[in-house]
C-alpha cells in the first residue's frame, strides 16, 4: 500500500514537471520578444545604435522599443565602442546592477577586440575580458542592419536555451 502511494506521488510530480517545461518555453519566448536595453554609449558605435532607433529601421516591430535609463530595469547591455581602463569598472558596475537574466552584445571592433586602439596603454582588449558576451557584432562601426541581425540572434539564443553557453 505504501508503494502505491509513493508511485502516485511520483506521477503527480512528473505531471507538474512536464507542465513547467511547457511554461519555460513560454517564458523564453516572452524574454526574447521583450528585451529592454540599457541606454548608454561609449564611442562612435553608439551613434549607430541611436540611428537604429529611428523610424527607418523600426525596431519596435520586434518588441525592442523600450530603452531603459536605469540598469535595474534593463536586461540587455549593448557595449558599443572603445572601453578604456578607467571606464571598465563603471561598465562592470552597470552590468552588476542589471536585472536577471541579463545579456550582453559587444558591438563594433573596439568592443570586441580593442579595434585600432588595441595597442594603446589605456584600452581594454575586448569586453569579453570582464563581461560574459552573448553576441558579437563586428564592424567599424557596424550598420544598424547588423545590430538588428545581432539582436535577432540573441533572441534565437534566448528562445533556444541549449544554444546559450556561459
UniProtKB/Swiss-Prot annotation:
UniProt GO BP: aerobic respiration; electron transport coupled proton transport
Q: What class of enzyme is it?
A: translocase
Fetch the Pfam families from UniProt: Oxidored_q6 (PF01058)
Q: Which domain of life is it from?
A: Bacteria
Its keywords, alphabetically, are: 4Fe-4S, Cell membrane, Iron, Iron-sulfur, Membrane, Metal-binding, NAD, Quinone, Translocase, Transport
| Catalyzed reactions | a quinone + NADH + 5 H(+)(in) = a quinol + NAD(+) + 4 H(+)(out)
UniProt-listed Enzyme Commission number(s)? 7.1.1.-
Topology in the lipid bilayer is annotated as:
Peripheral membrane protein
Q: How is the cofactor bound?
A: Binds 1 [4Fe-4S] cluster.
- UniProt key word Cytoplasm: no
Q: Where in the cell is it found?
A: Cell membrane
Residues that bind [4Fe-4S] cluster, according to the entry? 44-45, 110, 140
A GO MF label = quinone binding
* GO CC annotation, single: respiratory chain complex I
Q: Which cofactor does it need?
A: [4Fe-4S] cluster
InterPro entries in alphabetical order = NADH_UbQ_OxRdtase-like_20kDa (IPR006137), NADH_UQ_OxRdtase_20Kd_su (IPR006138)
Subunit and interaction comment: NDH-1 is composed of 14 different subunits. Subunits NuoB, C, D, E, F, and G constitute the peripheral sector of the complex.
| Record function comment | NDH-1 shuttles electrons from NADH, via FMN and iron-sulfur (Fe-S) centers, to quinones in the respiratory chain. The immediate electron acceptor for the enzyme in this species is believed to be a menaquinone. Couples the redox reaction to proton translocation (for every two electrons transferred, four hydrogen ions are translocated across the cytoplasmic membrane), and thus conserves the redox energy in a proton gradient.
Q: What family does the database annotate? A: Belongs to the complex I 20 kDa subunit family.
Protein name per the record = NADH-quinone oxidoreductase subunit B
User: Which organism is this entry from?
Assistant: Carboxydothermus hydrogenoformans (strain ATCC BAA-161 / DSM 6008 / Z-2901)
Gene designation: nuoB
Amino acid at each position: 500500500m505504501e508503494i502505491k502511494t509513493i508511485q502516485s506521488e511520483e506521477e503527480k510530480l512528473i505531471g507538474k514537471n512536464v507542465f513547467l517545461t511547457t511554461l519555460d518555453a513560454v517564458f523564453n519566448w516572452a524574454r526574447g520578444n521583450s528585451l529592454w536595453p540599457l541606454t548608454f554609449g561609449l564611442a562612435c558605435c553608439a551613434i549607430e545604435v541611436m540611428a537604429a532607433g529611428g523610424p527607418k529601421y523600426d525596431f519596435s516591430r520586434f518588441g525592442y522599443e523600450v530603452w531603459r535609463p536605469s540598469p535595474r530595469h534593463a536586461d540587455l547591455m549593448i557595449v558599443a565602442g572603445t572601453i578604456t581602463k578607467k571606464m571598465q569598472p563603471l561598465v562592470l558596475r552597470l552590468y552588476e546592477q542589471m536585472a536577471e537574466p541579463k545579456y550582453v552584445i559587444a558591438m563594433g571592433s573596439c568592443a570586441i577586440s580593442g579595434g585600432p586602439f588595441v595597442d594603446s596603454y589605456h584600452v581594454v582588449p575586448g569586453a569579453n575580458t570582464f563581461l560574459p558576451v552573448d553576441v558579437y557584432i563586428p564592424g567599424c562601426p557596424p550598420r544598424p542592419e547588423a545590430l538588428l541581425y545581432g539582436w535577432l540572434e540573441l533572441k534565437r539564443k534566448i528562445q533556444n536555451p541549449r544554444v546559450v553557453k556561459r
